[in-house]
């Protein structure tokens, strides 16, 4: 059974294996053991209530409960940009016009922005390619909404998610090549690694401070503004069906889109509800897949179950109850996996 649980110190080697499969561009999952260990430690301290809000971040893993294999990772940053500035570009417009010459030009322009400061962030979503089946991607991504719904007071009103931009298998980013490299004088992979390992001071020191006309970029770079990496397209679709939208903010490195949504308008958060759980043999039938989560902050668990999402009393097997760390009579959070039945 596939189960979402909080990360543990013993997961570091599994996270290193996952990091080696990302193909680059996933800044928050670098193949660096010291950085990953520090990330795990920060998550543990967040759960223990030892960190200020500006440093809090939760990390979860997707585990096969039968084999102990860690198949994926996802995370939530509680409030971005309160310690280090959180940069992106806002894609806007500057108008240059002359009535005398009968000239009017509306030029797409990139404006450096810290507009999302303080927002909660969905991040570090990666599923091992070998496990991209049977709804695992949906479970991994949407499990975070169950945690946010259960512990709403831990998070801010707006949620953002940076989507990985277009980058090829050799680490070539058209957007970086045309813009970032001119100011940072390093390859995309180097800048990505520095940022992922927490060495972010160079961003504020070197990045351009003035608006940038996109027409000055290569056509290849212009074409990838707001576009996602092919492997990230499914993750974008998942978030958009939950209510997230692209509001013309992009990543400063690869030009990938930043999606955003008011937390209380996220479908899975808004429609999730608490039901009593009982042990038994679940009813047979053509039921949709549903997310089921316990309400245990320190021992949070989420699984996928096929059931009636409108039920008031959820019947689970002993194995499912054990995976959820629940007992008969407990209340669990339930929501349909998708607005319409899908298979990952």
From Swiss-Prot:
Enzyme active site: 229
Residues binding succinyl-CoA: 125
Keywords assigned: Acyltransferase, Arginine metabolism, Stress response, Transferase
Annotated InterPro entries: Acyl_CoA_acyltransferase, Arg_succinylTrfase_AstA/AruG, Arginine_N-succinylTrfase
Reactions catalysed, as given in the entry: succinyl-CoA + L-arginine = N(2)-succinyl-L-arginine + CoA + H(+)
Pathway(s) it belongs to: Amino-acid degradation; L-arginine degradation via AST pathway; L-glutamate and succinate from L-arginine: step 1/5
Pfam families to which the protein is assigned, alphabetical: AstA (PF04958)
Up-regulation conditions: By nitrogen starvation, and arginine. Induced at stationary phase by sigma S.
Molecular functions (GO terms): arginine N-succinyltransferase activity; N-succinylarginine dihydrolase activity
Keyword Transferase: yes
The keyword Transcription is annotated on this UniProt entry: no
PANTHER family from the UniProt entry: ARGININE N-SUCCINYLTRANSFERASE, N-SUCCINYLARGININE DIHYDROLASE
Cross-referenced HAMAP family: AstA (MF_01171)
Similarity remark: Belongs to the arginine N-succinyltransferase family.
Protein's recorded name: Arginine N-succinyltransferase
Organism for this UniProt entry: Escherichia coli (strain K12)
Lineage: Bacteria, Pseudomonadati, Pseudomonadota, Gammaproteobacteria, Enterobacterales
Gene, per the UniProt record: astA
